[in-house]
């Protein structure tokens, strides 16, 4: 409805209709043109026609609803989820002020938690917020904005010393997590403009390899926001934009403004191009290291790691591999496994933090090489070097089993980070599991109870000491 809004994230009113249908009670109050109008609903049915209930100089709409507990087994709202979304909106709409108040809990003074989100810098501050824990390569965010054409475009970007790309894209304030034409336009302009500048500067002359789009985006954090009057999303969840004209609009704005920035800031431009060259060299070294790992596997027959205690079953769907912390844990795991279905691979110490390492270093790490070899997967397909080939996956359940302490948690995080960055298909395919070790073994005589929380431990002690003799209950902490 262009008479009400120039652009809108909602397209058909499905959202409010669904909220109404799934609520026992809903009340909508509209403040507009000096008047206040209201309508109430129960189980989706209007209780009366829209009526005027007063006058007011404020503008806006207030929606109050109560989820239907006959439909939802749980309707607890996560404060952090709501806060993150409102913070996001304050960055995307600079200058506005959004207040979040949680009335569910109050302090000793009877006050509830309240938080205000406000940003004068908009996307500049958004990028700085996202990159707050990373080391910058350029001092300030590169900011591009244009509302001259039919599609307003706003982009902010920073380069950092990491080896990953983080691009956040929005259409009419909706987070398009799968990207779309606006992201494609941004990437196309970024690659073309940076390559053109690098070629003219002569910095690529000594590089004896082709530079790819991935090289230009290594260490990049960017936020893209476009306003589209008639957005075409792929799917009802609105996670990917499909408007073809948006690609050209973003491409033009980013291409022109990025080129101007590079010409006016030669020092920063040189730093960015040097980062691109390092990325290309690391990618080439990683390709050679990856090929070497896979070639060794082929030449050495099965090539399975020496510490792997494999299972006898040949059907991958029935097989499980446990990645365990250290040789001693590996020994315990071997004693408790079913040899037919369970394989055990002990990992020595903490594996490499792939988030802070160049790719070729990853393939040189023994523990990571052992994991790759044991899983049987190969990297690189016709679609691209980073695509994981799962056709040779030897175990359809990959279970991370570390200790219940801080070190165990850290090792688990490092393994998950490796899978997320380099074996994402394992996670997306539902192959990765985490074994949750117990914190306590509570024992009295031949009776044993494993406990995962303090509360469970207390209950177990009481159950085993019904005669009141708690001193006779042994507690072992893992």
Swiss-Prot record:
<keyword id="KW-0963">Cytoplasm</keyword>
<dbReference type="Pfam" id="PF01751">
    <property type="entry name" value="Toprim"/>
</dbReference>
<dbReference type="InterPro" id="IPR014721">
    <property type="entry name" value="Ribsml_uS5_D2-typ_fold_subgr"/>
</dbReference>
<feature type="site" description="Interaction with DNA">
    <location>
        <position position="353"/>
    </location>
</feature>
<comment type="function">
    <text>A type II topoisomerase that negatively supercoils closed circular double-stranded (ds) DNA in an ATP-dependent manner to modulate DNA topology and maintain chromosomes in an underwound state. Negative supercoiling favors strand separation, and DNA replication, transcription, recombination and repair, all of which involve strand separation. Also able to catalyze the interconversion of other topological isomers of dsDNA rings, including catenanes and knotted rings. Type II topoisomerases break and join 2 DNA strands simultaneously in an ATP-dependent manner.</text>
</comment>
<keyword id="KW-0547">Nucleotide-binding</keyword>
<keyword id="KW-0460">Magnesium</keyword>
<dbReference type="InterPro" id="IPR013759">
    <property type="entry name" value="Topo_IIA_B_C"/>
</dbReference>
<dbReference type="InterPro" id="IPR034160">
    <property type="entry name" value="TOPRIM_GyrB"/>
</dbReference>
<dbReference type="GO" id="GO:0005524">
    <property type="term" value="F:ATP binding"/>
</dbReference>
<keyword id="KW-0479">Metal-binding</keyword>
<comment type="subunit">
    <text>Heterotetramer, composed of two GyrA and two GyrB chains. In the heterotetramer, GyrA contains the active site tyrosine that forms a transient covalent intermediate with DNA, while GyrB binds cofactors and catalyzes ATP hydrolysis.</text>
</comment>
<dbReference type="GO" id="GO:0003677">
    <property type="term" value="F:DNA binding"/>
</dbReference>
<dbReference type="InterPro" id="IPR000565">
    <property type="entry name" value="Topo_IIA_B"/>
</dbReference>
<dbReference type="GO" id="GO:0046872">
    <property type="term" value="F:metal ion binding"/>
</dbReference>
<dbReference type="InterPro" id="IPR013760">
    <property type="entry name" value="Topo_IIA-like_dom_sf"/>
</dbReference>
<comment type="similarity">
    <text>Belongs to the type II topoisomerase GyrB family.</text>
</comment>
<keyword id="KW-0238">DNA-binding</keyword>
<feature type="binding site">
    <location>
        <position position="403"/>
    </location>
    <ligand>
        <name>Mg(2+) 1</name>
    </ligand>
</feature>
<dbReference type="InterPro" id="IPR001241">
    <property type="entry name" value="Topo_IIA"/>
</dbReference>
<keyword id="KW-0799">Topoisomerase</keyword>
<feature type="binding site">
    <location>
        <position position="403"/>
    </location>
    <ligand>
        <name>Mg(2+) 2</name>
    </ligand>
</feature>
<feature type="site" description="Interaction with DNA">
    <location>
        <position position="350"/>
    </location>
</feature>
<dbReference type="InterPro" id="IPR018522">
    <property type="entry name" value="TopoIIA_CS"/>
</dbReference>
<feature type="binding site">
    <location>
        <position position="405"/>
    </location>
    <ligand>
        <name>Mg(2+) 2</name>
    </ligand>
</feature>
<keyword id="KW-0067">ATP-binding</keyword>
<dbReference type="GO" id="GO:0006265">
    <property type="term" value="P:DNA topological change"/>
</dbReference>
<feature type="domain" description="Toprim">
    <location>
        <begin position="319"/>
        <end position="438"/>
    </location>
</feature>
<dbReference type="InterPro" id="IPR036890">
    <property type="entry name" value="HATPase_C_sf"/>
</dbReference>
<dbReference type="InterPro" id="IPR013506">
    <property type="entry name" value="Topo_IIA_bsu_dom2"/>
</dbReference>
<protein>
    <recommendedName>
        <fullName>DNA gyrase subunit B</fullName>
        <ecNumber>5.6.2.2</ecNumber>
    </recommendedName>
</protein>
<dbReference type="Pfam" id="PF00204">
    <property type="entry name" value="DNA_gyraseB"/>
</dbReference>
<dbReference type="GO" id="GO:0005737">
    <property type="term" value="C:cytoplasm"/>
</dbReference>
<dbReference type="InterPro" id="IPR020568">
    <property type="entry name" value="Ribosomal_Su5_D2-typ_SF"/>
</dbReference>
<feature type="binding site">
    <location>
        <position position="325"/>
    </location>
    <ligand>
        <name>Mg(2+) 1</name>
    </ligand>
</feature>
<keyword id="KW-0413">Isomerase</keyword>
<dbReference type="GO" id="GO:0003918">
    <property type="term" value="F:DNA topoisomerase type II (double strand cut, ATP-hydrolyzing) activity"/>
</dbReference>
<dbReference type="InterPro" id="IPR006171">
    <property type="entry name" value="TOPRIM_dom"/>
</dbReference>
């Amino acid at each position: 409805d262009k008479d009400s809004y120039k652009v809108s994230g909602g397209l058909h009113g499905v959202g409010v209709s669904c909220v109404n249908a799934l609520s026992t009670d809903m009340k909508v109050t509209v403040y507009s043109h000096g008047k206040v109008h209201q309508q109430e609903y129960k189980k989706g049915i209007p209780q009366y026609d829209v009526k005027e209930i007063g006058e007011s100089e404020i503008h806006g709409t207030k929606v109050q609803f109560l989820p239907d507990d006959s439909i939802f087994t749980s309707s607890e709202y996560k404060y952090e989820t709501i806060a993150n979304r409102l913070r996001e909106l304050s960055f995307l709409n600079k200058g506005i002020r959004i207040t979040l108040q949680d009335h569910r809990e109050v302090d000793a003074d009877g006050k509830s938690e309240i938080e205000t989100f406000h940003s004068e810098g908009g996307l500049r501050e958004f990028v700085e917020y996202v990159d707050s824990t990373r080391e910058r390569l350029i001092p300030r965010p590169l900011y591009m904005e244009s509302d001259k054409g039919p599609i307003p475009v706003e982009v902010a970007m920073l380069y950092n010393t990491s080896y990953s790309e983080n691009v956040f894209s929005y259409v009419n304030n909706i987070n398009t997590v799968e990207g779309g034409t606006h992201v494609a336009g941004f990437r196309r302009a970024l690659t073309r403009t940076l390559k053109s500048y690098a070629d003219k500067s002569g910095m690529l002359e000594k590089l004896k390899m082709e530079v790819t789009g991935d090289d230009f985006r290594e260490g990049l954090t960017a936020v893209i926001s476009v306003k589209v009057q008639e957005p075409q999303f792929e799917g009802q969840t609105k996670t990917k934009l499909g408007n073809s004209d948006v690609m050209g609009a973003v491409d033009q704005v980013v291409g022109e403004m990025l080129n101007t920035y590079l010409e006016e800031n030669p020092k920063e431009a040189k730093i960015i191009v040097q980062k691109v060259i390092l990325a290309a060299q690391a990618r080439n070294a990683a390709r050679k290291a990856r090929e070497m790992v896979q070639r060794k596997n082929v030449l050495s027959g099965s090539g399975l790691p020496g510490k792997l205690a494999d299972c006898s079953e040949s059907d991958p769907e029935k097989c499980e591999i446990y990645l365990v912390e250290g040789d001693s844990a590996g020994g315990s795991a071997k004693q408790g496994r079913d040899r037919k279905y369970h394989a055990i691979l002990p990992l020595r110490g903490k594996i490499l933090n792939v988030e802070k390492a160049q790719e070729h270093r990853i393939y040189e790490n023994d523990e990571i090489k052992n994991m790759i070899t044991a899983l049987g997967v190969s990297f690189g397909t016709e679609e691209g070097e980073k695509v994981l080939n799962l056709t040779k996956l030897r175990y359809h359940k990959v279970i991370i089993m570390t200790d219940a302490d801080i070190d165990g948690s850290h090792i688990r995080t490092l393994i998950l980070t490796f899978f997320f960055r380099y074996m994402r298909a394992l996670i997306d395919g539902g192959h990765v599991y985490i074994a949750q070790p117990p914190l306590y073994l509570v024992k009295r005589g031949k009776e044993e109870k494993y406990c995962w929380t303090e509360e469970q431990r207390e209950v177990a002690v009481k159950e085993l000491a019904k005669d009141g003799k708690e001193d006779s209950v042994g507690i072992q902490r893992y």
